[in-house]
A protein has these predicted regions:
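Short, basic (Lys/Arg/His-rich) helix/loop patches that form interaction surfaces
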Residues: 36-40, 98-107, 117, 167, ...
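N-terminal core-binding DNA-recognition domain of tyrosine site-specific recombinases/integrases
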Residues: 1-66, 82, 103-105, 209-216, ...
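Conserved catalytic core of the tyrosine transesterase superfamily
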Residues: 25, 101-112, 138
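Catalytic-site neighborhood detector that most strongly recognizes the C-terminal catalytic loop/helix
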Residues: 79, 83, 144-145, 260-286
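A short, basic/aromatic helix-end/turn motif that makes direct DNA contacts
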Residues: 126-132, 257-263, 273
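Short, charged phosphate-coordinating catalytic segments
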Residues: 59-71, 93, 114-145, 254
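DNA breakage-rejoining catalytic core of tyrosine-based enzymes
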Residues: 16, 67-69, 79-98, 136, ...
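DNA/chromatin major-groove-contacting recognition/catalytic segments
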Residues: 91, 95-99, 150-155, 249, ...
């Protein structure tokens, strides 16, 4: 059972592409996978067994020199012991936006874009100008920047069809992106006598390569400290905040899953169960007021 599940879900990955987030998502998918006898889903004990098997395989790969470390180490947390995901409330979101506006336009644009669309930090770094459809106000998410241990950042395509998706922009976000492009064009003209090409990354280094996601993580922590904002937040918290705000507005789970690029709606429901529970309570209260019960 374990080898088949491992091969079906992770068999297309190179060893060096097995990052912690990929492995954690695999465990979460297995929690929703049906048993062979049709009697419900896999038990937590089965998921733990998959983890132990994968750990053994990757430890052998380290011993043979194929990997420098075991990415599955400390990846497994039994269900029910998940750490609460930090999410900014509406008041904190307002403070974050104000703080972003005190940064250079590059950082303001990046952080507002992640908050507005729920992109992963690497997906935002992988965006090119050609991915934006200004008329339809959409962005085609079709690649991401990944930082591997002891290696330079690389750009990779999504591993699943759900990761390759469209996200939608408000008029205000479009205006900010256009302003950022104008600044990029001015900067390129001044420093290199060049123009911005459609194939250029939105957030690029001087050598033309996409910026490292870790650069934005470091800057985000500085912003939190400088503005007395909760230090448990991270760039990824902006993605969680986006999802939580969508749910609070009554957006259904399948739509949220599609926007976030989750392969299964059940993954979204599991991650944001608390937010959906709040919506259920609100719905029940509305019904109670309507019928007087």
């Amino acid at each position: 059972m374990a080898p088949r599940n491992l091969c079906n879900s992770l068999g297309n990955y190179k060893l060096t592409d097995l990052r912690k987030e990929v492995i954690r998502e695999f465990y979460e998918e297995m929690r929703h996978a049906p048993r062979l006898d049709g009697r419900g889903n896999l038990s937590e004990k089965s998921v733990e067994g998959l983890h132990n098997t994968l750990c053994g395989i990757l430890s052998a790969a380290v011993d043979e020199g194929y990997l420098t470390h075991n990415p599955a180490w400390r990846c497994y947390k039994p269900k029910g012991q998940k750490k609460e995901r930090p999410v900014a409330d509406e008041e904190t979101v307002k403070k974050l936006i104000t703080a972003f506006e005190g940064q250079s336009m590059k950082y303001e644009t990046y952080f507002k874009l992640v908050l507005a669309t729920g992109l992963r930090r690497g997906e935002a770094c992988g965006l090119k100008w050609s991915d934006i459809n200004w008329r339809k106000r959409t962005i085609h998410v079709q690649r991401g920047v990944v930082k591997l241990s002891h290696q330079e950042s690389i750009t990779k395509d999504p591993k699943t069809s759900s990761g390759d998706r469209m996200v939608y922009l408000s008029k205000e976000m479009c205006q900010l992106l256009k302003a950022w492009r104008k600044e990029c064009e001015w900067d390129r003209a001044q420093t290199a006598n060049e123009t911005v090409d459609e194939d250029d990354y939105l957030f690029r280094q001087s050598n033309g390569k996409p910026m490292n996601p870790c650069t934005f993580t470091y800057r985000f922590k500085l912003i939190l400290k400088a503005n007395n904002l909760p230090l448990d937040l991270s760039v990824h918290s902006l993605r969680h905040t986006n999802a939580s705000l969508l749910i609070a507005q009554g957006v259904d789970v399948r739509t949220v899953a599609s926007l976030l690029g989750h392969a299964q709606a059940s993954t979204t429901l599991d991650i944001y169960a608390h937010a959906f529970d709040k919506n259920k309570r609100k719905a029940q209260e509305k019904l109670g007021k309507a019928i007087g019960l």
